[in-house]
Amino acid sequence: MKKFHKHIFFLILFFQYFVSNSQNTVYQIDITKEIGSTTWRYLRAGLLQAQEQNAKAVILRLNTYGGTVVHADSMSTAILNAPIPVSAFVDNNAASAGALIAIACDSIYMRSSASMGAATVVNEP
């Protein structure tokens, strides 16, 4: 737990340096469930709210084993088209669709015990 707090502290310190002008709003969006239509709408609303509030950056905290490829692709596209920097923080897992979403971010940070990968599309009959 101590290492986790240390990593968050350095991540916040980095963003404080990065957004050093008068407006220091940094949004955090947590994706901790299966990637699907609900998480897609949640991310889209969070990015829109961050933009409306003139946030300087968004931290996307990921802990997911994946989900549907269509929603992961939509989320990745929204991140790539975001007018503000989006950084992924892999809190524990970013597998499958979670990895695809993390790769779309401007930068990726991971907790030392976190894992990311297995970003393979699975065809189901």
Q: Regions from the language model: what does each represent?
A:
Residues 1-8:
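Bacterial N-terminal signal peptides that target proteins for export
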Residues 21-125:
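Soluble extramembrane regions of membrane proteins in the secretory/endomembrane system
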Residues 8-17:
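Bacterial N-terminal signal peptides
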